[in-house]
Amino acid sequence: MNTIEGTGTKPANVVVRGNASGFLQEIVSGAHQLRADEPVAVGGSDAAPGPYDYLLVGLGACTSMTVGLYARAKKWPLENIVVSLRHSRIHATDCAECETKEGMLDRIDVEIGLNGALTPEQRAKLIEVAAKCPVHRTLKSEINIRLRTAPSGSLSESVVTKVESRPTETAKRTAEEKI
């Protein structure tokens, strides 16, 4: 399998399985099992975060990890990081710094709390570093999403098996060791 250029890591493989009668989705990402849903107001059961929540989770986690990694490498006194994110749709005319001038566009507001005895210069550098997290850069770059139809039945059985299986004892021990 190819690696993601410049990272040495393999591309993520996520499988999402849903029932056509509702919004609740079962998600398998490596050894992790998640769910996604929509709020009751739009027809979901609000049993799990929604798709935009997961988008924000990815950006927030990557931002926090990147800032923490940089601060540790510099041995700066950063105690913890809190990243708060909000997604909204706005009119392009309400965004002076945006290239798009007509219609609607997506906005993600990010607030970063940096706790610790940091100098103003260190805080400014950490905010600069936050904008360089890989997920932030992906969202700001051109994205080519290739959609195709899988052969009938080729995904359904393997996904059911993965979603319904329980972690092995080895997987449980590995997860516990990471904690």
Per-segment meaning from a language model:
Residues 66:
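Conserved phosphate/anionic-ligand binding catalytic regions in large, soluble enzymes, centered on
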Residues 1-57, 69-179:
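Extended beta-strand/beta-hairpin segments
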